[in-house]
Amino acid sequence: MTFEGQYYHTLKATIYDKPAQPVPIYISAGGPVAAKFAGRYGDGFICTSGKGDELYRDQLLPALEEGARAAGRDPSTIERCIEVKVSFDTDKERALKDTRIWAALALPAEEKVNIHDPREMEKKAETVADQAYRRWLVSSDPEEHVEQVGHYIELGFTHLIFHAPGDDQSRFLRLYAQEILPRLRKRWG
């Protein structure tokens, strides 16, 4: 590929180690129009948790399937991914406290849309930090947590991406690998 851009120029650039198969394209959607587009053109669909079952069950997943069928595709061939906001710790207070780091998630979209300075966003988020946990699956009980997460599998998601809020990610990964992942695999494969 030859390219003459403002900052970069290439002359007959190529990739020598091309993948054996085409790179899958995953399309993110937060509403039915984008989900339908993902069904028509994507290899996978991605959305985020914490928005209420009605959005997934009644809007996003049906629109994804509608888009796939309209394109003559089998909807079951499209991977359904969801980024699940989880705060799991053997200490419930710590699990709750960890969610405060992402307090901005508790702000309504209309309050965030015109904030461009991270310091201003942080200040605004402090006003709702005590409500941040509402956007997360918070638990200290492994069985309870597996039930919370499994709900997304039951809704029809085929790939779960876990997002933990705390600042000790090593601790989270160790606890999740020991306490949660084996239980999820045992129950749902």
Language-model-derived ranges and their functions:
Residues M1-G189:
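Active-site-adjacent structural elements that line small-molecule/cofactor binding pockets in enzymes
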